[in-house]
Amino acid sequence: MDATKTAPIEIAKTKSLKQVIEINNLKKAFGQQEVLKNVSLQLYDGENLVVLGKSGSGKSVLIKCIVRLLNSDSGTINVLGEDVSSLKNDGISELRKKIGFLFQSGALYDSMTVKQNLEFPLKRIQKNLSQKEINEKVIDALEHVGLLNALNKMPSQLSGGMRKRISLARTIVVDPMIMLYDEPTTGLDPVTSDEISSLINEVQKNYKTSSLIITHDIECVRNTANRIIMLNDGEVYMEGSLEEFENSNDQLIKSFFK
């Protein structure tokens, strides 16, 4: 697999596309500290949207509010036609089945083999599958990330980059409609980071996902973004294409894209 050469697919003008996530005037504070201040954004069908910002800008809080790992203080979050804030526990569980979440840590179960890690969400979410169908889905997901040979390994036997790729395989094995990536390349060497970025693009192409990518890694931005939103101090600072960001004369933007 030559992962480093995979680019994000071309997306038509977003205004003509369906919104799969719509956020309006979102606020979230912890005590007196406002983390998100009137954040509004849209994720369109089939695109890779990168949310960029320095540490502490509210990026990870935003993504946790989307899947109700955190409750927002005010504003609205609409995901796949559902008002997230109004959903009861059963509704949230059903919505999360349609969303893949790649955690920064990878979050594999250390006591399970790679195969068992991938089987777990399938048995929980797609309960009518036969063992043969489960096996086929597991193999397909591992082939997509180039790690079929790790099928029977334990997480402790994997490198950091391999763990991240297995975590991605576990996320896509249930065929999510939306992918949420929380700092997917953090802690990885440049070569492995490029491979992960390329895999994000392959997931976009092969699984027809809409992806929201939280990062402060500029190379990840360059490799994956169809569109970029920059957060600064909990607010949307700029929205645009990679070209618009790289050509901006704004000093804060230039400090990221130097």
Put a short name on every predicted segment:
Residues 154-158, 162:
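Conserved ABC ATPase signature
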Residues 179-182:
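Catalytic Walker B motif of ABC-type/P-loop ATPase nucleotide-binding domains
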Residues 173-177:
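A short, proline-enriched helix->beta-strand linker immediately N-terminal to the Walker B motif
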Residues 67:
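Helix-to-loop junction immediately C-terminal to a conserved catalytic motif
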Residues 83, 131-149:
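Conserved ABC ATPase "signature" region
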Residues 112-120:
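Short coil-to-helix segment of the ABC ATPase nucleotide-binding domain corresponding to the Q-loop/switch region
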